[in-house]
């Protein structure tokens, strides 16, 4: 699918979609509980992968209007009858690899081409240290993965610099083992807010996990716990809302986005980023509304350590801002659905913007965006960010636009509803 974007601005009021990060975790924890109701979940390709995987591990999940009714396995996942195919969802792969380790049988997990190239070695090594037999069939740390259950609590270490999903996966599984676990993080924990989201959901389900954060971060996880999520309402998604807010800031127009209450989401940093760049923005935390009323943007330096999903959005903001925007501490952004640093550099270059790329850094020199045929890299965040660029440049066509179904299936409808000129076509 392709999308053609014309020069346009935005106006009006819109609701932010539900959080993908919270939805993944709520479904997983509910599937490990008994009876739960999840209100206003995000239903997208990625979260449907988690639903399907949880069902294969023994949970019963029914969609009833804007809620999910979940009868879980009470901490004892079954052995699936077939291979778990997670599609394009790295979150599902990492979470279900650890959850499958709680069972007694053998589980095989795989995914699409992108998933089969993403690293999982540190997670597999820790699971082996905790009494599980877990292997990458090709010996490269990537899917397909084979897990034979028997997860036991113990003392373990894991590298925190590649993906916080490894840590979240272990935090979801380890409280359900018979023995306690001590998990030490080596190096900087990248994308830490996503671990905070995991801890937030686990706390709401009654789990107890203790943190020691002196010289090195350490999680103390008592064993033999039970999850009881009961009822949970998924908050709005700041990652997805970043495109709506950035669109108004870039085009010097006005918008109000609802359903953005405070939570543990690190991507709420988009509000401070836009403010630092010169946008007129106001967040009413009590009402859960964010209003943007244009502004003259200038370049900034952004540390992407905690907020990798904002990198494509900020790269496009930098393309229209005065001066240079420098995105630092961003090597882990290369290990997403695609190498997002490289992808944004390549596509912005096509649109007339000067960029320079280093191992953990992307520099964007603000300039005049020009319409072009650009590649979406089969990556939802690349497609959505380039849509914003097209609204400034006009006459821009983006391929692999179907990638939006991963996290924001209604993205183009949402953008049209607030004034964006977007036209979809089959390739």
UniProtKB/Swiss-Prot annotation:
Positions annotated to bind 3-phosphoshikimate: 20-21, 25, 163-165, 191, 309, 336
Organism superkingdom: Archaea
PROSITE patterns: EPSP_SYNTHASE_1 (PS00104), EPSP_SYNTHASE_2 (PS00885)
Enzymatic reactions: 3-phosphoshikimate + phosphoenolpyruvate = 5-O-(1-carboxyvinyl)-3-phosphoshikimate + phosphate
Pathway: Metabolic intermediate biosynthesis; chorismate biosynthesis
HAMAP family: EPSP_synth
Enzyme Commission number(s) from the entry: 2.5.1.19
Gene3D superfamilies the record matches: Enolpyruvate transferase domain (3.65.10.10)
GO MF terms, alphabetically ordered: 3-phosphoshikimate 1-carboxyvinyltransferase activity
Gene Ontology cellular-component annotations: cytoplasm
Family of the protein in this entry: Belongs to the EPSP synthase family.
Ligand binding (phosphoenolpyruvate): 20, 90, 118, 165, 340, 381
Residues spanning the membrane: none
Protein name in the entry: 3-phosphoshikimate 1-carboxyvinyltransferase
Biological role: Catalyzes the transfer of the enolpyruvyl moiety of phosphoenolpyruvate (PEP) to the 5-hydroxyl of shikimate-3-phosphate (S3P) to produce enolpyruvyl shikimate-3-phosphate and inorganic phosphate.
Subunit structure: Monomer.
A biological process from GO: aromatic amino acid family biosynthetic process
Keywords: Amino-acid biosynthesis, Aromatic amino acid biosynthesis, Cytoplasm, Transferase
Compartment(s) where it occurs, according to its Swiss-Prot or TrEMBL record: Cytoplasm
Pfam families noted in UniProt: EPSP_synthase (PF00275)
Annotated catalytic residues: 309 (proton acceptor)
């Amino acid at each position: 699918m392709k999308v053609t974007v014309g020069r346009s601005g935005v106006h009006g009021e819109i609701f932010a979609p539900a959080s993908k990060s919270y939805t993944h975790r709520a479904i997983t924890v509910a599937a490990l509980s008994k009876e739960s109701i999840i209100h206003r979940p995000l239903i997208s390709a990625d979260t449907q992968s988690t639903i399907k995987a949880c069902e294969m591990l023994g949970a019963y999940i029914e969609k009833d209007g804007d809620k999910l009714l979940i009868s879980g396995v009470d901490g004892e996942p079954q052995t699936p009858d077939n291979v778990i195919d997670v599609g394009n969802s790295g979150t599902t792969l990492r979470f279900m690899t650890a959850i499958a380790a709680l069972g007694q049988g053998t589980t095989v997990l795989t995914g699409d081409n992108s998933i089969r190239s993403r690293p999982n070695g540190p997670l597999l090594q820790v699971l082996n240290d905790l009494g599980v037999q877990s292997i990458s069939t090709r010996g490269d740390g990537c899917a397909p993965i084979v897990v034979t259950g028997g997860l036991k609590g113990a003392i373990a270490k894991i590298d925190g610099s590649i993906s916080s999903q490894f840590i979240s996966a272990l935090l979801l599984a380890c409280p359900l083992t018979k023995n306690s676990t001590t998990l030490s993080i080596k190096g900087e924990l990248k994308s830490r807010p996503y671990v905070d989201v995991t801890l937030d959901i686990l706390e709401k389900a009654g789990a107890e996990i203790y943190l020691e954060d002196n010289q090195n971060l350490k999680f103390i996880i008592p064993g033999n716990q039970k999850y009881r999520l009961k009822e949970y309402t998924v908050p709005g998604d700041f990652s997805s809302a970043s495109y709506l807010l950035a669109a108004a800031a870039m085009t010097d127009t006005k918008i109000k986005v609802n359903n953005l209450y405070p939570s543990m989401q690190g991507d709420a940093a988009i509000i401070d980023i836009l403010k630092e760049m010169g946008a007129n923005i106001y967040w009413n935390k009590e009402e859960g509304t964010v209003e943007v009323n244009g502004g003259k943007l200038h370049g900034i330096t952004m540390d992407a350590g905690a907020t990798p999903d904002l990198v494509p959005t900020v790269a496009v903001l930098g393309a229209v801002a005065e001066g240079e925007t420098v995105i630092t501490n961003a090597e882990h952004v290369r290990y997403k659905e695609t190498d997002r640093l490289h992808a944004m550099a390549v596509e912005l270059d096509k649109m007339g913007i000067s960029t320079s790329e280093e191992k953990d850094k992307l520099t964007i020199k603000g300039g005049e965006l020009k319409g072009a045929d650009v590649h979406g890299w089969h990556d939802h965040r690349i497609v959505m960010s380039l849509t914003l660029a097209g609204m400034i440049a006009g006459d821009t066509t983006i391929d692999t636009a179907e990638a939006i179904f991963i996290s924001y299936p209604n993205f183009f409808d949402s953008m049209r509803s607030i004034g964006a000129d977007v036209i979809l076509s089959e390739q």
